[in-house]
């Protein structure tokens, strides 16, 4: 019978005997190191995302201000044009 990855299934007794053949300290250290790298990359992406979000908020506020100024200028233009 094959396992989930297509490997031949190991009897329970053999798995218990071969416990030492499982993940060793070096494998756990390597996995831990990879997880640390992934975590570091995710932290970096989160920082970039936060920075972009802040910049977009600034741009949105700037565009709102510019739109309000244009609307005010258009509303005031007829009264400024008369002598």
From Swiss-Prot:
Pfam families: UPF0184. One of its GO terms (cellular component) is intermediate filament. This is Bublin coiled-coil protein. The keyword Cytoplasm applies. Belongs to the UPF0184 (EST00098) family. Essential for intermediate filament organization in intestinal cells, interacts with intermediate filament and regulates intestinal lumen morphology. Residues 1-24 are annotated as: Disordered. The modification Phosphoserine is found at residue 82. Residues 25-74 form a coiled coil. GO terms for molecular function: molecular adaptor activity. It is found in: Cell junction; Cytoplasm, Cytoskeleton. One of its GO terms (biological process) is apoptotic signaling pathway. Keywords: Cell junction, Coiled coil, Cytoplasm, Cytoskeleton, Phosphoprotein. It comes from the Eukaryota. InterPro entries: BBLN_eukaryota (IPR005374).
């Amino acid at each position: 019978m094959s396992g989930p990855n297509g490997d031949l299934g190991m009897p329970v007794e053999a798995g218990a005997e071969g416990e030492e053949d499982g993940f060793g300290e070096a494998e756990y250290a390597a996995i831990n190191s990879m997880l640390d790298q992934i975590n570091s990359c995710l932290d970096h992406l989160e920082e970039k995302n936060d920075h972009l979000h802040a910049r977009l908020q600034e741009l949105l506020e700037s565009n709102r201000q510019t739109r309000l100024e244009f609307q005010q200028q258009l509303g005031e233009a007829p009264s400024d044009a008369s002598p």
